[in-house]
Regions:
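Short catalytic/metal-binding and nucleic-acid-binding patches
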Residues: 1-137
Length: 137
């Protein structure tokens, strides 16, 4: 997914980020909790206003407002880095070798120990109430 090149702190954004290879990593409640806890943490530490989020089996949608001090790219980097580490550790603790093999194999391609998220993210300006309502439904 491409990174949004221009960031306007006056806008709300509809952001989507996906699991590597669109693998269904986010089915377990414990994995969802890692994502939710991280989003709530970013609300306070990165002055991010979180309006709505939904966790699908292989991707996450969020509607957020970011501050100038902590732009979208920085927040997404921190979110993905932290959650990747926690999600990988959880799969290790669970002994889920099938998922660990996929994450390790994808990591090797880019000279990392593992890879949980696809590169980049998609961010769209929430340009109207209708667009916002459509994404919230």
């Amino acid at each position: 997914m491409p990174v949004k090149p221009n960031f306007n702190p006056d806008y709300l954004y509809f952001v989507t980020t996906s699991a590597v290879k669109h693998v269904h990593l986010f089915r377990q409640d414990v994995i969802k909790r890692i994502i939710v806890d991280s989003l709530y943490h970013l609300r306070t530490t990165r002055q991010m206003e979180l309006f709505v989020f939904v966790i699908m089996p292989n991707h996450v949608h969020i509607i957020v407002h970011f501050s100038e001090e902590y732009p979208l790219s920085d927040v997404m980097r921190d979110f993905k880095k932290f959650t990747a580490r926690q999600i990988y550790r959880q799969f290790q603790a669970d002994g889920n070798t099938r998922i660990l093999d996929v994450l390790s194999r994808e990591g090797e391609r880019v000279k990392l120990e593992y890879k949980v998220w696809d590169d980049g993210y998609d961010a769209r300006d929430v340009y109207s109430i209708e667009f916002l309502q459509q994404k919230m439904d």
